């Protein structure tokens, strides 16, 4: 069990980075199970154009019994949102839930159990195990993700089947260690996920993957520009290769 937290039912912060996700804000709260006694929800809002911020304020008022906070991004991108949210989180355990809800909030208790029972210290969701909604991960996306997972598994000497799944879970203590090591990899991480993966493997944390059902988004448009992100990912691979394999 969790020696570095030292409690059986540790508090948790669920971080929800969101930009133009007005239609998903309330569902995230409604569908999130109460899997621990002390659950904090932090929305980090990315200067949306569709009234997402107003909707978050409405939801905070509508659910007074839940501990929901909102922060507005100064910078841009998911990486910036994750850093801002986690820096302000009070939970012993930190989780990321993407606001598009393609990873069902109902699956988060599995991540909680995996970290609390000591199965792993860095829990990564994987969307490649369960069958997916037809629309959820298009063919090109699926193969790109497969390819990058193989590359990153080789680079990091850890098996990752899905490096791009948005749901990651780790303890606040380990997150703080990753932050103090961050200069090693620099701030080049437009996705906000890879500095956590790099940092976790550099600290030799025990990485465990939790399979999740991956659903098509119900509201809004995907904010992934495939080719731009593919190019950025390729740069990340080369960058990591220089850092990790050329010693």
Each model region followed by its residue ranges:
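Acceptor/aglycone-binding surface of glycosyltransferases and processive sugar-polymer synthases
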Residues: 67, 73-88, 105-186, 190, ...
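A conserved hydrophobic helix/loop-capping motif in glycosyltransferases and polysaccharide synthases
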Residues: 12-21, 28, 35, 44
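A conserved acidic beta->alpha catalytic loop
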Residues: 45-54, 101
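Donor nucleotide-sugar binding loop of glycosyltransferases
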Residues: 21-24, 48, 78, 104
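Short aromatic/hydrophobic "clamp" motif used to bind/position activated sugar donors
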Residues: 94
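Short beta-strand/loop segment that forms part of the nucleotide-sugar
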Residues: 38-48, 71-72
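Hydrophobic helical membrane-anchoring modules
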Residues: 1-11, 27, 34, 181-247
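Acidic helix N-cap motif at the loop->helix transition within catalytic regions
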Residues: 23-27, 50-59
